[in-house]
Amino acid sequence: MGKIIGIDLGTTNSCVAIMDGTTARVLENAEGDRTTPSIIAYTQDGETLVGQPAKRQAVTNPQNTLFAIKRLIGRRFQDEEVQRDVSIMPYKIIGADNGDAWLDVKGQKMAPPQISAEVLKKMKKTAEDYLGEPVTEAVITVPAYFNDAQRQATKDAGRIAGLEVKRIINEPTAAALAYGLDKEVGNRTIAVYDLGGGTFDISIIEIDEVDGEKTFEVLATNGDTHLGGEDFDSRMINYLVEEFKKDQGIDLRNDPLAMQRLKEAAEKAKIELSSAQQTDVNLPYITADATGPKHMNIKVTRAKLESLVEDLVNRSIEPLKVALQDAGLSVSDINDVILVGGQTRMPMVQKKVAEFFGKEPRKDVNPDEAVAIGAAVQGGVLTGDVKDVLLLDVTPLSLGIETMGGVMTALISKNTTIPTKHSQVFSTAEDNQSAVTIHVLQGERKRASDNKSLGQFNLDGINPAPRGMPQIEVTFDIDADGILHVSAKDKNSGKEQKITIKASSGLNEDEIQKMVRDAEANAESDRKFEELVQTRNQGDHLLHSTRKQVEEAGDQLPADDKTAIESALSALETALKGEDKAAIEAKMQELAQASQKLMEIAQQQHAQQQAGGADASANNAKDDDVVDAEFEEVKDKK
């Protein structure tokens, strides 16, 4: 069985790890970094860039450089959180035909899973380069508070990237695996506070050790899938924009290029303020007006940043209380607090968490890598490489159906350990009703319309009977990925309907297959592009070396040959500016043929140099005709 890799598909950064024997290893990407920015850029010449190369060109291509796509995955365009992003993101978010949030990239409609798949492909390639073999299976992490649609969309992204997603696991649970696996901790209850680039989770997890087997049981989870470092960045950007407007009277929001530079500077300043008390945001030539160029130079203190984001940090505290309450525990029952996600490096976040739990969070867990390591461990559990580990996760939100009066009736309560199955018998609301609609919901509200609609289906063929008489058994079955399968059966007629919830939105099978084919076609074009670059490099090398040899040959090279070579050099130079690999190779061949006389001269010169070297050695040898003498040591007489 091949390796199952572990991928932390993050909002801001992503990370990939594998099991190396019994140890998890985080892999470095092609740029030599252990994490990869979750940024995808579509350039004017049709190239797709991922990670650091995409980030570097963002300033000149803001509309087609996509980041924080995880905030859109599995979401509806009309969602309040999506509408908030529509107004602040430099790229274009649009409503798809099915009501989902999609993106408009250079006039082409693209689904978030399709874009996230580009990041997953880079993670896959990183693992393949390290292992030296193809990788087809992965464990991918998601925020614990992701709903069914968001989990399904993440699995779709994996498929588009050419990966069979063996398991979707929750990020805090993965971090707990990374923390607890190599520690002789005995029985402990830990809180994992995960504040990443775009999402926030809190999970209360119990680690039990019985006869050498460790059980990781999630007791409760809570969170906010639209709270993270990107929101902190936005506060800083807004502050800088307002300060500049006060100072210069210019609103930078109308200038996408300036806003992209400002985004980078704001993120950098935020990071610097985790270790420094003050920083300068210095952006020369940020914009210009009739009076000339304008420069930004604004001092920002740590206290100022804290005042800007205090409410965001406080927003993360309420879910902590709910999670503890759901787990039936108090703060004193928590043995360890683990911080995950880059935003937890902010001193104010650490201080608030320490105040809430009454203890300092542990510092021995890498907030950027723990989740990917945990995913790799879960991959090892699935392949059998990691033994004596049992993971018991939970469903983050209640699941149920809409019943008479527009009420949500829960069949599976939140924080139920998964996989799980639950059935309940319902009946008809009208006399002689021959069909019922099963409307599947996810959420905690009593009114059905206030919850997330996951989908609906009809059960037909119910025998006519007075209302309340037919017995319709509805069964909810959640698999280990937290994905829901629903069936409804009329106990009288035996008629049954089943669906796997694909959400009322999401990608259908045809769309996924098309995206998989597109990804494969892109892989082919990527390979061709790589081959073109290699051929170009060979052509450049040939140009340089031939010119050098022409120079060295001097008058020894006949004029006719020199003219032919110059002509072939010029033709190759022109071909190198184009995109045709075959044309470059043909011109290289022509240059090689035109340079035959030059090669002969070069070989003669080389032979003469060799001969000259040999003569010099021989002369030296003659001079070295020295007689070895024997010496006798004469000791001084004392």
Curated annotation (Swiss-Prot):
The modification Phosphothreonine is found at T199. Pfam families: HSP70 (PF00012). NCBIfam families: PRK00290.1 (NF001413), PRK05183.1 (NF003520), prok_dnaK (TIGR02350). Belongs to the heat shock protein 70 family. The keyword Phosphoprotein applies. GO terms for molecular function: ATP binding; ATP-dependent protein folding chaperone; unfolded protein binding. SUPFAM superfamilies: Actin-like ATPase domain, Heat shock protein 70kD (HSP70), C-terminal subdomain, Heat shock protein 70kD (HSP70), peptide-binding domain. PANTHER family: HEAT SHOCK PROTEIN 70KDA. The gene is dnaK. Disulfide bonds: none annotated. Acts as a chaperone. Residues 602-620 have a biased composition (Low complexity). Residues 602-638 are annotated as: Disordered. It comes from Citrobacter koseri (strain ATCC BAA-895 / CDC 4225-83 / SGSC4696). Induction: By stress conditions e.g. heat shock. The keyword Phosphoprotein applies. It comes from the Bacteria. This is Chaperone protein DnaK. Keywords: ATP-binding, Chaperone, Nucleotide-binding, Phosphoprotein, Stress response.
